[in-house]
């Protein structure tokens, strides 16, 4: 007997939510480490010159974490992603866009290349950086799959 599966094999929406929560946890660890070692955000484009804590609270974030306002937006989008229908889709799309922003932020940050250089390698900092890169990639992947699944479900329901 052949039955139609209503649930996809991969629950991409839940994967996106869990990955986003882990990204927030990693941002918290990164913030504590950056404040302890005074690693403010330094990019070729935007540099405030503020200490790490002040940069986290009011600037571009630290070398190891996004700014506070992006963490708050991430939390709000996670809560939205739990909702059904279009509010949930707003959360999913928003988290996917944040994944892209976080990934770009890691590659623009000059500290990323410094800590991954064998001469200036710093294990705790490198772990936070690599974890954020992996989590941002997962946020993008889960987000795209969740959007495609939602569109497919919406099209099937319209038939």
Model-derived segments and spans:
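Helical transmembrane-bundle signal
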Residues: 19-34, 74-77, 95, 99-109, ...
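Membrane-interface helix-boundary signature
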Residues: 5-19, 84-91, 121-128
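Interfacial non-cytosolic loop connecting adjacent transmembrane helices
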Residues: 42-61, 107-131
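Alpha-helical transmembrane segments of multi-pass integral membrane proteins
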Residues: 110-159
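Juxtamembrane helix-break-helix junctions at the cytosolic face
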Residues: 73-96, 149-151
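Cytosolic juxtamembrane helix and N-cap/initiation of the first transmembrane helix
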Residues: 1-36, 145-155
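Hydrophobic transmembrane helix segments
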Residues: 21-68
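Hydrophobic alpha-helical transmembrane segments
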Residues: 57-73, 130-141
